[in-house]
Amino acid sequence: MPESMDAIILKDVVKSFRKRTIRGEYTTFKSELLRWLRGKRQSRDASLITALRGINLTIPKGKTVGIIGRNGSGKSTLLKLITGIYTPTSGDLQINGRISALLDLGAGFHPDFSGRENILINGIILGMTRAEVRARMDEIIAFSELGEFIDEPVRTYSSGMYMRLAFAVATHVDPDILIIDEILAVGDEHFSKKSLAKMMDFKRQGKTIVLVTHELGTVERWCDLAAWIDGGYVRRVGKPSEVTAEYREAISLAEAQSAAFTPPALTEGGGALPQVPSESLPAEGPVRIHRVQLLDARGESLEVLSPEEGLEVRADFSVEGPCEDVDFHVRLQAADGRTLYETSTRSEAVVLSRMPNPGVLRFVVERLGALGGDYSLVVSARASKGESSGRCAFRVVSATEEEGVFRPPHRWLVEPGANSQAGVRFEPGTSPRVEVG
């Protein structure tokens, strides 16, 4: 039988849970009998909460897939089905490969065992032999950077230490599939960069990554595909920039309609967000943007940079028809969607005499100057017949505490005024200071 090209396959998967009684206990034979004697017996359907109502989703091998959706839409339930923590109420679920997961903080760790002992236990649970875990023990400990704390009980660990240990174990057991639920922020800036580099290494090795997050910029920056869970169903799967754009539009429509944001599982019919009218989504024009990348000065992929660094935005496109009036736009956005800067070839009088097919658009920024935070760059090809766009997200990390969104080039000078007296003299090797008074 040929090996499947898909890592995860879900067909008509339903997951339901029993409601709790008023006392906070699950319904039992006794509680149902008492309800029946009081004339308050519930139907089977009334005693259930259905989180997933028929999930159909295929995740190809080697792809990074971002799962998005409102709180309560079933994203975490879906991951727990994939990892085997839950079993489907009905439907088929197929997993092809070894899974490692980063779910609830500290899940799978025994609080009274040391970090070293928990590494051994978790490695065995994830399918490794004792000898394999011991062979990788030093590498896992070194990556976690826990030092002498590795031999202390994990109940003494901070949340950041928990996350470091969990990430180190999950990424060093050689999984085929890595599952992550909202825990990419693993520790300080240094460890976050290290973790991102490890994730990039996973992608280069062709591993499958499934990520649940509310950070849409992370999905746009990291993922090959996005899947939107809404009302207990998969509402859309596709290009991350397109799926997140429709999701944002649906959220905006719900807010405009003053729709109640009740958890979908507690809402009759699943509480799906409003449908986005097709006219709200621009038609695709003659120039199609296929991929947008962020590169550094060496031409290498860029995820994190400092305010003083430059960057290059590179967009691959194809021409599908006459495009005499095409106009390329580049827009810098903050994490909350605010436009910080936008320009276009037309506004800068850039002549587009002949369009190559396929072609590459390059937008070079010598120095970005943005302060620390999450940003995205959107490249659009606009024409009278429609528009095509792509997005790449990135993070700026700054060691300096500053306010605002932009750092202009500047320097500080302290000089004597026209009528000033002799100033403070600085001896070589001493720290200069200005005294007032």
UniProtKB/Swiss-Prot annotation:
Superkingdom of source: Bacteria
GO BP terms, alphabetized: polysaccharide transport
One Pfam family of this chain: ABC_tran
Annotated localization: Cell inner membrane
One GO MF term: ABC-type transporter activity
Entry keywords, A to Z: ATP-binding, Cell inner membrane, Cell membrane, Membrane, Nucleotide-binding, Polysaccharide transport, Sugar transport, Transport
Protein's membrane topology: Peripheral membrane protein
The UniProt record lists the keyword Transmembrane helix: no
Main location: membrane
Family: Belongs to the ABC transporter superfamily.
Function noted in UniProt: May form an ATP-driven O-antigen export apparatus, in association with RfbA.
Name of the protein this chain belongs to: O-antigen export system ATP-binding protein RfbB
Lineage: Bacteria, Pseudomonadati, Myxococcota, Myxococcia, Myxococcales
